[in-house]
Design a protein with these regions (language model features):
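Polyanion-engaging groove/track-forming segments
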Residues: 1-185
Length: 185
């Protein structure tokens, strides 16, 4: 009888989708439960890191936790180049929000600028502005009421087009057969 079956695994990583697929194929009803850290879910990680980054003058760890959710509209390659530049120059606070364009060599002190280096820095500066703009709008929100802060956060999520990104990710996961993961989006 199905009600007398239990499948236990110390680590369900990698087994969950397989178990779902096999049980579904043979028509065996099932319930699967696993402990998960809710703050590691991409949407919550995005929200908490955006609030922390904007509220703490853009520390690199929070800013890049926000970008590493994959929900901000920049590619992994773009994010990695931006992170390398930020770590090379130990960028903090006003370095992210300054009006003056970035002009530090992408490889550090004492290097001669080539045309390629200048183009890369200009591109990184444009990327920085694109990344920071929605966070700055959140940070500069004047309405400190709960409603005002919620609306500012909602605006950030709208500015980065979160609903579309979530739908795309869910569709991608569903096409790969990862229905449980897709349902979380």
């Amino acid at each position: 009888r199905c009600r007398e079956i239990a499948v236990c695994a110390r680590r369900a990583d990698g087994y969950g989708e397989l178990i779902d697929s096999v049980f579904s194929r043979y028509g065996v009803p099932m319930f699967r439960s696993a402990m998960e850290d809710i703050l590691e879910k991409p949407v919550l990680a995005l929200v908490t890191s955006a609030l922390a980054a904007a509220g703490s003058d853009y520390p690199c760890d929070e800013l890049f936790r926000y970008l590493k959710t994959g929900l901000t509209g920049i590619s992994d390659e773009e994010r990695d180049l931006l992170e390398n530049y930020a770590l090379t120059w130990d960028l903090k606070g006003s370095a992210w929000t300054r009006k003056k364009p970035w002009d530090m060599h992408p490889e550090g002190y004492g290097r001669e600028f080539t045309e390629a280096d200048a183009a890369l820095v200009a591109w990184l500066d444009a990327l920085r502005r694109r990344v920071i703009a929605p966070l700055e709008a959140l940070r500069k929100n004047k309405d400190k009421t709960g409603r005002g802060r919620a609306l500012a956060l909602y605006q950030l999520l709208d500015d980065i087009d979160l609903p579309t990104r979530l739908a795309q990710r869910a569709d991608s996961l569903d096409r790969r057969g990862e229905r449980t993961a897709a349902a979380q989006y």
